[in-house]
Structures are given as C-alpha cells and as structure tokens.
C-alpha cells in the first residue's frame, strides 16, 4: 500500500469516527429530528462552524442569517410561533446543509431528579396488584401512538454533537421503554387538555443528591442564617456539585422550555437534611431560571413519598420524624414565586419500597398543577388540603385549610387520622378530628390545654384526610421553625 492510499484511508477513518471534522456546521444534541419547539417564545437555534462562516436558518416561513464568531460559535433566534401539529423541516446552511425533519411547535417541559423521576415506562408496564390513583385503561407502552407527544432522554455520556441528529422520538415503542414514566404521563395529561404538541425532556440519575444538579459555583454562595448562627457553605459536604449539571443540564441551554418538573430528595433525606436542603433547593430553582433567562419560569415538584428511613440499613441513625422535617424543607420552596408541589403520601403500598409504583398518578397530579397555575384552568384543583392557621378555643384547636376544593373529606369514610396535638409538655397524642366546612376541630381528653398540632408527622404517613377531589392533605406542624427565616 503506497503512502497516498494510507493518507486517504486515514482521513476516511477520521471522518467516519469524527463526522464533525467534515461537517462545518455542527448542532448540539438537543436540536434534532422530531423535536418540539416551544410555542410563543423566541427560539434560539445555535451551534458551531468555521469562524466567519455565514449561517442561514430557514423554518416555518422564517429566514435568519448570522455569522460564526472568532470561536466558531453562532446563534440565530426564530420569532415566537403558534402551536402547530404540522410536521415541518428546518434547514441550517453554512458550507454544508443540515435538514431536520418532522418538527412540531407546542409545549416543552424538562423533568429531572433521581430514580423516581428516572423510573422507566418499561417498569411501569409490569405493575401488578392494588391500583391507586386513576390508572390508565391500557398499557401505554403497547398502545401509545400519539405522534404529537415527543420525548428526549438525556443520557449522561451521549450528549456530544453527532451527525445523526437523533435523540428526539415519538413517544411510542422502543423509545418510550426507557423514558421517565412520570414525564410521559405528565405530557399525556397535558395533551389531553391542551390538544397541542407536547415535548418532554427527561434528565435524571438514580441515587443522585441535589448538589450535582447545581452549577458548582452557585453552591459557593454566601452562607445562610439559621437561628442567628451561620450555616456552613452549602457545598461544605461535597456531594459532587455540578457533576450532572455540567453533562445533563448545561448542554440543553438555551433550548426554550415552558418549565421544570423535579422529583428528588431521597438521597438528601438519608443525610437527615432539612433547612440545608431548602437552601440548596432554592439555589437550584433560581440558578436554572437564571440559565434560561426567566426568573418566573414554572417549577413544579414532588414531595417525596413515605419511606422507612428509620428502619433502613443506612449507616446514619434516623428517626421517624426525619422525613416529615424533610417534607417541611421541600414545602418551603412554595414561598418562591411560580412554584407548585404535589403530595403523594397515599401512593405507597409499603414503606420499605423507596420507589412507589404509581407513576401515572404522580404525572397526573403534576399536570393538575401546571394546568391550574401555568395554563390558567382555575377550575382545576391541584393540591390537597394545606394548613393555613389555627385558633385555640377552650380545650380545642380549630384548624383552617386552603386548597379545600369542593370540600374536605375522608378517603374511606372513617374519622380523620394522622392528627396529633400537644400542650406545654410537648407530648403529642392522637387527636380526635371533626370536619366543619373548611376547618377541622381537634381535641383530646389527654390534652387539657392544647398548643400545637402535627399532621402526618411520621415517615409512615398515610392519613385518610383528603379534599373532595381525592388529593391528600399536606403534612405539617404548626410550630414550623423555619417559615419566619427562610
């Protein structure tokens, strides 16, 4: 073989292994065939090319031009577009032309977190036994054929640009098997109400703490205050700050989204965190919104499920109250504008299973929050009864709730469970609970002068207290120490 042939073969091999060497215009992985573009927002289209190369983007009657800068980076912005189920092609041209096919315009959401968000549709389809929530009439893994729901699964090691422009898929068949069940059912519920294309992006890692999802520099912010004492910096206990942010969130920026869904916390609860988690959570919400240049971007999350942390084999000691304290920390995020939370204390068959199976109901409940708060369907009730205030009257406590919907109720028709009260001795005992309108009257013959209340204040919480829409009441304690300082 002569030298010339060796050179040709070497170049051919390089171009086959690294197609970007031959393609002057390169797109990020998130831009590809089958994608959904966010409606009614400016849509950035970006990538790299040779410095100074002229780039043209044509889509939906729009024609945009720009030039790659000295670093080879370029970006154009498409004008806001109405939703469209009409599949269209986008042409990106420099010295080469890339044609992205089958593109829709609609609503796009990013869902993230740990294993309960990552929990795949293939696991969901194997569920047997007692049904909780509004179970689908069929196995979506076998029957899903709605071409207007698209999915993109962020894989940790496969977000580099490539020449296939794959990644986005119609939510059906093989592509749907590995996708987040919560994300899919959320998107399905949105489509059934909005009747426009839905794009769901899933970026989740089993067992992950919250720190890897936050840009490392953001966790180096000023220490927070707790009862007048300085907390250590939020990154003091390590937790691999920024690890998954760098590989699974940053590559998505600035792909336009409507909002975020978050289902995470078990790994931080194992650390017995409470207020520290609340500050980390706030940092994550604010930093992601800042990344997408929208300080009011919707952020909806799941209050994690009951689980027996105190009976687990973890090396740290836990009490049955560690989880309620974590729930309390999660709920503090509701003080941040444009956030929403769902409670799932009723979706657990066993507190030794950290992965409760009813993901279709988790997705549905998250969709209720979005439909009410983002899409302004104000007739949709999106939360269970939520503590508002209490008044002490003689030897009873009168508790007022918000999110009562069409009225307060008991899931099984029996007296309400889960309430405890205490007097000055702080010894909590089970309380008798009587519903009156949007209030609950609590009392106990063992507490003559009640002062404080707790509801579902245990890791095994499973109260029958709901509103008429079937949504469970949110755990709380009336003496929450954090609400005045967070």
Locate each region found by the language model.
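Bacterial Sec-dependent N-terminal signal peptides
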Residues: 1-24
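Cell-envelope and extracellular/periplasmic
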Residues: 23-486
């Amino acid at each position: 073989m002569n030298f010339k042939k060796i050179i040709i073969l070497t170049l051919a091999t390089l171009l086959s292994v690294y197609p970007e060497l031959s393609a002057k215009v390169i797109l990020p992985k998130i831009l590809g065939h089958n994608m959904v573009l966010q409606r009614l927002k400016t849509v950035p289209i970006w990538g790299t090319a040779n410095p100074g190369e002229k780039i043209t983007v044509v889509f939906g009657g729009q024609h945009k031009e720009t030039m790659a800068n000295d670093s080879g980076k370029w970006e154009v912005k498409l004008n806001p577009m109405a939703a469209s189920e009409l599949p269209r092609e986008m042409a990106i041209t420099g010295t080469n032309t890339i044609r992205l096919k089958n593109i829709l315009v609609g609503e796009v959401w990013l869902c993230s977190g740990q294993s309960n968000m990552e929990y795949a549709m293939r696991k969901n389809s194997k569920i047997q036994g007692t049904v909780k929530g509004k179970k689908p009439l069929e196995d979506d893994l076998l029957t899903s054929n709605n071409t207007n729901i698209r999915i993109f699964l962020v894989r940790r090691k496969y977000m580099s640009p490539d020449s296939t422009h794959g990644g986005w898929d119609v939510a059906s068949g093989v592509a749907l098997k590995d996708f987040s069940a919560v994300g899919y059912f959320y998107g399905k519920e949105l489509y059934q109400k909005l009747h426009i294309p839905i794009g769901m992006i899933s970026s989740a890692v089993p067992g992950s703490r919250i720190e890897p999802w936050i840009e490392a520099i953001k966790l180096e912010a000023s220490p927070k205050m707790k009862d007048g004492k300085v907390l250590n910096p939020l990154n003091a206990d390590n937790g691999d700050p920024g690890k998954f942010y760098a590989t699974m969130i940053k590559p998505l920026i600035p792909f336009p989204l409507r909002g975020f869904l978050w289902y995470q916390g078990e790994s931080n609860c194992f650390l017995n965190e409470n207020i520290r988690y609340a500050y980390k959570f706030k940092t994550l919400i604010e930093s992601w919104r800042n990344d997408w240049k929208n300080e009011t971007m919707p952020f909806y999350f799941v209050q994690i499920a009951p689980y027996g942390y105190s009976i687990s084999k973890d090396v740290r000691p836990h009490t049955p109250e560690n989880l309620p304290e974590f729930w309390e920390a999660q709920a503090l995020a509701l003080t941040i504008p444009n956030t929403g939370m769902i409670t799932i204390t009723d979706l657990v068959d066993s507190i030794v299973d950290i992965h409760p199976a009813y993901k279709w109901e988790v997705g549905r409940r998250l969709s209720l929050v979005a439909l009410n708060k983002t899409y302004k369907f104000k007739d949709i009730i999106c939360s269970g009864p939520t503590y508002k205030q209490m008044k002490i009257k003689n030897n009873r406590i009168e508790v007022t709730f918000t999110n009562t919907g069409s009225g307060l109720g008991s899931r099984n028709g029996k007296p309400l469970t889960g309430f405890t009260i205490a007097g000055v001795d702080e010894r909590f005992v089970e309380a008798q609970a009587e519903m009156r309108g949007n209030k609950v009257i609590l009392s106990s013959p063992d507490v003559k002068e009640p002062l404080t209340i707790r509801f579902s204040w245990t890791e095994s919480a499973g109260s029958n207290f709901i509103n008429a829409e079937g949504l469970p009441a949110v755990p709380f304690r009336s003496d929450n120490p954090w609400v005045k300082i967070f």
